[in-house]
Amino acid sequence: MTNIRKSHPLIKIVNHSFIDLPTPPNISAWWNFGSLLGVCLVLQILTGLFLAMHYTSDTMTAFSSVTHICRDVNYGWIIRYMHANGASMFFICLYMHVGRGMYYGSYTFSETWNIGIMLLLTVMATAFMGYVLPWGQMSFWGATVITNLLSAIPYIGTNLVEWIWGGFSVDKATLTRFFAFHFILPFIISALAAVHLLFLHETGSNNPSGITSDSDKIPFHPYYMIKDILGLLMLILMLTLLVLFSPDLLGDPDNYIPANPLNTPPHIKPEWYFLFAYAILRSIPNKLGGVLALMFSILILAIIPIFHTSKQRGMMFRPLSQCLFWLLVADLLTLTWIGGQPVEHPFITIGQLASILYFSTLLVLMPISGIIENRLLKW
C-alpha cells in the first residue's frame, strides 16, 4: 500500500514542496527568509481580512473607522498594529532575502529571480496603497506626492495621474480604488509566490558554496522544518515585542492627524522601508530624472545577472566582492537615513553621493571586482 502523501494528487504537491523536497545539506540561516515571507504573507492576509470587516473606504469615515477598530472592536488594536508592523517585518525579511540572493549568486536562476523582482514590486505597490488607507495627513500627502510623480512622463503624464486619482485631486475615488487594489493584490502575490516556488523547485535550491549539491541532498522535513521553526519563533518574538511595547515606533506621528488637503505637513516622507528609494528620487533635481532613478533603483536587480563577471557563483570565496557587498548595505542604510531627513544641506549632498555610490557599486565596481578575482585565481 502506497503512502497517501505520495499518491494523493493534492497532498503529493505539498509533499514534494515541503516534506520530501531534496535540499542541499549546507544551507545556512539565510535560507530561512523564504519561509518567513510566506508566514508574513499569510499573517498580513488574515489580519487584513479582519480589518477590512470594520474599515470603510470613504474620505469622511476612513480615519474614524480606523479609530473605531482600535477603540471599540474586540482586540482591534492588536489586529491593526500586527498588520502595520507585520508590513515592516515583511520588508525586513524581503530585503534580507534579496540580499542573500545577491550575495550567494541565486540570481543565476533567471526565472525564479525575475518572478522575485515582480513579487518585490507588487509588495511595494500593495504596501504603498495600504499606507494611504488610514487617511491621515501622511497618507493623503504621501499619495499625492508619489502619484504626482507619474506626471513627469511626457505627453500622457497629467492624464495618467488624473486617471489614477479618478478626478483632479486625491479624493474619495482614489481611496476607494486603493482599498480595492490593496485587498486583491495579496492574493496575486500568493499566486506569484507559488510560481516562484515552482521555478525554484525545477532547479533546486542554491547553497553557500555555489556549487551543485545534487549528489548529497537531504529531505526538507525534519531537518529544515525544525530550522525554519526557530526562525519563525524569532520573527514572532520580534513582532510581538514591537506590537505590545512600541507599536508606533516605525509609524509617523502626522498620520494621527486626519487628512487635510489645505495643510501640508513640514516633511512628507513614506514608510521607512521606502526611504532608500525616496532618497534616490530626491537626490536628482530634475523631476523626470528622479522618477527614472527611482524606478531603476529597483529594476537594476533585473540586470545584475548580466553584470556577473566572476567564474564563481557566490561571494563566499571572493573577498573583494564581499567588501563591495557590505559597502552597498552600508550605502542603503545611509540612503534610508537620508530619506527621512529634511531637504537641506548637508543631507542633499550626502544623498547625492550615496545615490552615485549605489549605482556605481552595482554597475561598475562589482563587475570589475569579478574580473580582478578571476585574474587572481590564475596566480
Curated annotation (Swiss-Prot):
Taking the first listed entry, what is the main subcellular location of this protein, grouped into a coarse class?
mitochondrion
State the InterPro entries in the record: Cyt_b/b6_C, Cyt_b/b6_C_sf, Cyt_b/b6_N, Cytb/b6-like_sf, Cytochrome_b, Cytochrome_b_C_euk/bac, Cytochrome_b_N_euk/bac, Di-haem_cyt_TM
What superkingdom does the record give?
Eukaryota
Q: What biological processes does GO assign it?
A: mitochondrial electron transport, ubiquinol to cytochrome c
GO MF terms here are: metal ion binding; ubiquinol-cytochrome-c reductase activity
Required co-factor(s) are: heme b
The free-text note explaining how the cofactor binds reads: Binds 2 heme b groups non-covalently.
Q: Which residues bind heme b b566?
A: 97, 196
Q: Where does a ubiquinone bind?
A: 201
Quaternary structure, per UniProt, is: The cytochrome bc1 complex contains 11 subunits: 3 respiratory subunits (MT-CYB, CYC1 and UQCRFS1), 2 core proteins (UQCRC1 and UQCRC2) and 6 low-molecular weight proteins (UQCRH/QCR6, UQCRB/QCR7, UQCRQ/QCR8, UQCR10/QCR9, UQCR11/QCR10 and a cleavage product of UQCRFS1). This cytochrome bc1 complex then forms a dimer.
* Family to which this protein belongs: Belongs to the cytochrome b family.
Other comment: Heme 1 (or BL or b562) is low-potential and absorbs at about 562 nm, and heme 2 (or BH or b566) is high-potential and absorbs at about 566 nm.
Q: Which PANTHER family match?
A: CYTOCHROME B
Task: Tell me, in a sentence or two, what this protein's role is.
Answer: Component of the ubiquinol-cytochrome c reductase complex (complex III or cytochrome b-c1 complex) that is part of the mitochondrial respiratory chain. The b-c1 complex mediates electron transfer from ubiquinol to cytochrome c. Contributes to the generation of a proton gradient across the mitochondrial membrane that is then used for ATP synthesis.
What is the official name of this protein in its record? Cytochrome b
